[in-house]
Regions:
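Short, low-complexity N-terminal intrinsically disordered segments enriched in polar/charged residues
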Residues: 1-32, 36-40
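Terminal "cap-and-tail" regions of soluble proteins that handle hydrophobic small molecules
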Residues: 2, 56, 115
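Surface-exposed, charged secondary-structure patches
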Residues: 11-14, 43-50, 54-102
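Residue-level signal for short amphipathic helical patches enriched in basic/charged
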Residues: 29, 97, 113
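Short beta-strand segments enriched in hydrophobic/aromatic residues
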Residues: 38, 94-96, 122-123
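Residue-level recognition of short loop/turn positions
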Residues: 41, 50, 113-115
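Short beta-strand edge/turn micro-motifs at domain boundaries
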Residues: 102-127
């Protein structure tokens, strides 16, 4: 059995760069920048600070950014939890979005035609 590394370090960097588009879009309140990270058919689900389950198409995120604006002081930590040649799971811990809310996100990414895209975002928002 060959002892080969299936995923190059550069792929981790590419995954993080994709997620960084999401973060920088939040920081600047820029939906076009956020959209660089997400597949057009991406979905998102999660719990709001009041415990209500929210979900649906990624356009809900764009509406949220339109409503609450930029997050110039946002703090984040990004961890690639798992990666294969075509899939990845990333955790984003963030403090201080445009509404002042703290979150933990889990993003599932697929590599489409050589480009990483987030296809699903699940989140937990804290009070």
């Amino acid at each position: 059995m060959p002892n080969t590394k299936p995923v190059a370090t550069a792929e981790y960097d590419a995954v993080i760069a994709t997620v960084q588009n999401y973060i920088e879009g939040l920081r600047g309140g820029s939906n076009p920048t956020i959209a660089k990270a997400f597949n057009k058919d991406a979905t998102m689900y999660g719990f709001a600070p009041d415990g209500i389950l929210l979900g649906g198409p990624i356009s809900n995120l764009y509406r949220y950014v339109d409503e609450f604006g930029s997050a110039p002081e946002i703090k984040t930590r990004v961890d690639v939890l798992a990666i294969t040649p075509s899939t990845a799971v990333v955790r984003v811990d963030m403090e201080g979005d445009g509404a002042g809310v703290d979150y933990t996100d889990f993003h599932t990414l697929l590599k489409f035609e050589g480009k990483w895209e987030i296809i699903a975002k699940v989140f937990h928002a804290y009070e």
